[in-house]
Amino acid sequence: MDECILELQPAHLFLNIGTNDLNGPDYDRAAMLGRYEEIVQQIRKKLPETKLYLLAYYPVNPTVAEDSGLIECFRWRTNERIREASEGVQALTRKYGAEFLDLNKDLYDAAGNLKAEYTIEGMHLYANGYRPVMDALLPLLRKIGEEQGGKQ
């Protein structure tokens, strides 16, 4: 984290971390959020002026999984668990003066799952799945650019 984030001293930092912690029967929401909070604390300590954005977790679609290992994974990595984890991340934003970004509204199908056309196997996004995420993020990025006087 030092070389990839802290030494760069970014003015803005977007975190989308921890989704693999949602997998498996041993998932513990408090423990996962505790690890997430430790990372946020390190960032806040070393980069107090950095504008921090914490992202909601992407939804999944268990109906497109064909691999038996993935089907087992979806017993644990559910959209309900993802929503609960995202709510925990949102609570951290209030505690640490960060901003919560849910960029996922156009990723959902009518059943509340990740749209099948956006996913490889129900969990990871195809490139086209990132388009709606980027479309939701672009207004904020433009605003940041304007605030910095066009500096990137």
What kind of region is each of these model predictions?
Residues 26-35, 73-76, 120:
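Active-site cleft segment of glycoside hydrolase catalytic domains centered on the general acid/base Glu
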Residues 59-152:
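Catalytic His-Asp segment of secreted/periplasmic serine-dependent ester chemistry enzymes
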Residues 8-13, 47-52, 96-99:
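Loop/turn elements at helix/coil->beta-strand transitions in domains of secreted/extracellular proteins
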Residues 5, 40-45, 90-93, 145:
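N-terminal cationic-hydrophobic initiation segments that often serve targeting/anchoring roles
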Residues 36-41, 86:
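Generic structural signal for well-ordered alpha-helices
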Residues 16-22, 41-82:
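Active-site segments of SGNH/GDSL-like serine hydrolases
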Residues 1-33, 59-61:
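Oxyanion-hole/transition-state-stabilizing segment in secreted/luminal serine hydrolases
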